[in-house]
Amino acid sequence: MQKLTILLLVAAVLLSTQALNQEKRPKEMINVLSKGKTNAERRKRQCEDVWMPCTSNWECCSLDCEMYCTQIG
């Protein structure tokens, strides 16, 4: 009986996790669609100074990201 209870609890957790993942997918799709911005649109927002953490070049004022914004030159 205990094994059946544990099995039912595990199944409930798996189903609830799957439901949460399905709710997040529309937001991910919006993020994917918004990544197609031009450089001018990207520069409208604040850019990071030298030595600030970054994940891509367009986040830095220098447009040079190597885990941190670096200075060109």
Swiss-Prot record:
The protein depicted here goes by the name Conotoxin MaI51
On the tree of life, the source organism's domain of life is Eukaryota
**In what tissue types does this protein appear?**
Expressed by the venom duct.
PTM Isoleucine amide: list the residues: I72
Instruction: Name its cellular compartments.
Output: Secreted
Tell me the residues on which Pyrrolidone carboxylic acid occurs. Answer: Q46
This protein's GO CC annotations: extracellular region
